[in-house]
A protein has these predicted regions:
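Periplasmic c-type cytochrome electron-transfer domains
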Residues: 1-22, 62-68, 83-101
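Short charge-dense sequence patches
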Residues: 15-24, 46-51, 146
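Axial heme c-ligation environment in periplasmic c-type cytochrome domains
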Residues: 50-56, 74-93, 97-111, 142-146, ...
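Electron-transfer interface patches adjacent to heme c in soluble/periplasmic c-type cytochromes
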Residues: 58-66, 83-93, 126-128, 146-163
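Short, flexible helix-adjacent loops and helix caps
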Residues: 17, 46, 60, 105-108, ...
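A general structural signal for well-ordered secondary-structure junctions
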Residues: 61, 78-79, 106, 127-129, ...
Length: 172
């Protein structure tokens, strides 16, 4: 492979990523590589699917700079959210789910009493959700996604949020 492709890739090795992105040959190579290695999960339109992020929006858990994207492609990303169902129990999981929904859903789409109880759980032990998701749910780069927008890797329904809190998530 090195004999066959080494000369082609050498052209881009020391070129700034911004220049590589504008190069027509690099664009063709990139499209071929995306179609070979990425399309299965992220889709032909790169808009993702359940469990696989949309690559066309501005919501990047690991950062959206060219260098951060390069690192993600080169090294991959493994993210784990611990399951909180056993520690919290069903009712407190529902409280936290309603609090999370209060960040991005209009009143009436979540239970305000449960959300008020969920606030205390989100910001305190044992869960301390804010350490990964930020004090106001805005997310912490590389730790936990933004919960205040309408971008949900695993779907933003109450059922899906409860499932995520209860069972955790393992993204690779």
């Amino acid at each position: 492979a090195n004999e066959q492709y080494g000369k082609i890739y050498a052209k881009f090795a020391n070129m700034p990523i911004e220049e590589v992105a504008k190069d027509p040959q690099a664009q063709r190579i990139g499209k071929n590589m995306f179609d070979t290695y990425c399309i299965q999960c992220h889709g032909s339109d790169a808009k993702g699917s359940k469990g696989f992020p949309n690559l066309t929006d501005g919501d990047w858990l690991w950062g959206g700079s060219p260098e951060q994207i390069h690192e993600t492609i080169a090294k991959g990303r493994i993210a784990i959210m611990a399951p909180w169902g056993p520690a919290l129990g069903e009712e407190r999981v529902k409280d936290v789910a309603n609090y999370v929904m209060s960040f991005s859903k209009p009143a009436g789409q979540y239970d305000e009493e449960r959300a008020a109880r969920g606030n205390a759980i989100f910001h305190g032990p044992p869960a301390n959700c804010f350490t990964c998701h930020g004090d106001k749910g805005q997310g912490v780069l590389g730790l936990g996604p933004n919960l205040t927008d309408d971008v949900w890797l695993w779907c933003g329904t109450q059922k899906a949020i409860i499932e995520t809190i209860t069972n955790g998530r393992h993204n690779q």
